[in-house]
Structures are given as structure tokens and as C-alpha cells.
Amino acid sequence: LDPADFQPRLTGIWQIRHAPDTGGAIVDPLPFPLFADGVWKTGPDPANAPIRWLNAGANGGHVGAQHALVVRWHALGAGQARMAGNIQRTQKGGVDLEWNLASSATLPPTSGTLKAESQAEVDGPWVDVKAGDTIDFILRAPHGDTCGGFTWNFRIDGRETPEAKPVEVANLRTQFPTSDSPPPVASSGDPWADLIQMLWSSNEFHFID
């Protein structure tokens, strides 16, 4: 029996997070306190919220000065995964934004600068993941919040082995999280129970005294 055959299949959920931008790695991003009007934010009116302008919805949002906006995909199974998609600035002028990908698994450096009136194609590398691992897209506004809004569209491609054909296992726009419930616990199969069931089904245990 191959234990890999009984690992949870590769699925996952999206989470929207934020954190102070200290210039270093974002280790424990925070959940947003409020989801209303289709977006996550830190107060009813983003213009006067505790973290001004910071908000995120299925189609895009706005960053906050010296804060990081984090799109997190939380794996619920095992395999290989990558984050891909694009992000585009929607307003003329404004300061540069910075973005990068990060993961709790080993991930080669992937980052870029998002200038005014520009867009970036995000094509993350393949990484080995197991249930509980995360892949993050992190957007920063180190030069202030005079940057206008943005649109985005991200997905997770997955495969169980390097030889397998990739498939889309998650899409941010169609699966955008509207609650902050903890991710479900993925359960592995029981190889011995499956073996007994297989033998029983094949009549190996069926006999008459």
C-alpha cells in the first residue's frame, strides 16, 4: 500500500488577511474585522476606517499605507500547487505598489513592482503542499495610499504529481470568502479499512463452514 494514495485530495480555501508592513516577512497576518458591501475592511467607511482605504473584494480593492494586503490559499490536501493570475491598477497616477508570493512551503522568490497604469501577470512556481500549508499573494503600499484601486483575478492550479495534468482547484472570484470560519480539517483515508473493504467486495472473506 502506498500511503500517498490515502492522503486528502488537493483542495483548499481562500482567506483575506492584512498585516503591518515592516519590510520583512509577513508571518501571522490578521483577519479583517468586518465584511460588508461585498468587501473586507477595517471599518464601515474605508475613508475613515482604522486602516484607511484598506479593503478587498472578489474583483479587487485598495491597499492601506504601510500595510500589507494578503490573499491566502490554505491547502486542505496534498499535491503540488501554484498561484497564478493578474492584478491591474485602475487609476492614473499614484505611488508604486510592491507585491510578492510567499508560502509556508519552500517557495523561490517571486515579486514585482506595480506602477501606476500598469498590470502584472502572476505566475507562481510549483510547490509541494500538504494539508495546512499556505500560499500567499502579498500586496504592499510602502510609499503611501495615494495609489487608487486595483482589480485582480487569481487561481490555484494543482496536480497530484509532476507528471499529472494541472487543473484549476480554486478561483478567487468565484470562491471569494465572505466569512472567516476556520478551515475544515482534512482527513486521510484508512488504508487498512480500504483493504478489508476491497477483500470483502471481492468475496475473499465469503465462505461456508
Regions found by a protein language model. Give the residues of each.
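Short, structured secondary-structure elements
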Residues: 187-209
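Gly-Asp-aromatic-enriched flexible segments
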Residues: 1-186
